From Swiss-Prot:
InterPro entries according to UniProt: Ribosomal_bL28/bL31-like_sf (IPR034704), Ribosomal_bL31 (IPR002150), Ribosomal_bL31_A (IPR027491), Ribosomal_bL31_sf (IPR042105)
Top-level taxon in the UniProt lineage: Bacteria
Cofactor note: Binds 1 zinc ion per subunit.
Gene name tied to this protein: rpmE
Organism name: Fervidobacterium nodosum (strain ATCC 35602 / DSM 5306 / Rt17-B1)
Keywords on record: Metal-binding, Ribonucleoprotein, Ribosomal protein, RNA-binding, rRNA-binding, Zinc
Subunit details: Part of the 50S ribosomal subunit.
Stored Pfam families: Ribosomal_L31
Presence of the UniProt keyword Metal-binding in the record: yes
Protein name as it appears in the record: Large ribosomal subunit protein bL31
Amino acid sequence: MKKGIHPEMRLLTVRCACGAEHKIWTTKEQLKIDVCSNCHPLYKGSGGASLIVDTEGRVQKFKKKFEGKY
């Protein structure tokens, strides 16, 4: 590796809006995040992939179209 052309890596403590702190290696000097794995609904099990929001009936239309074919 050539000297002087690579950015300096440092261990940074990232602070989330919920108060959690995570340590990562980065070239940034400061990083703040709004949501982390401690407060995101997908990781907490209160929604995410298990929650389907369908306001226009697309899921029902799809199920009706392919009902009994597979």
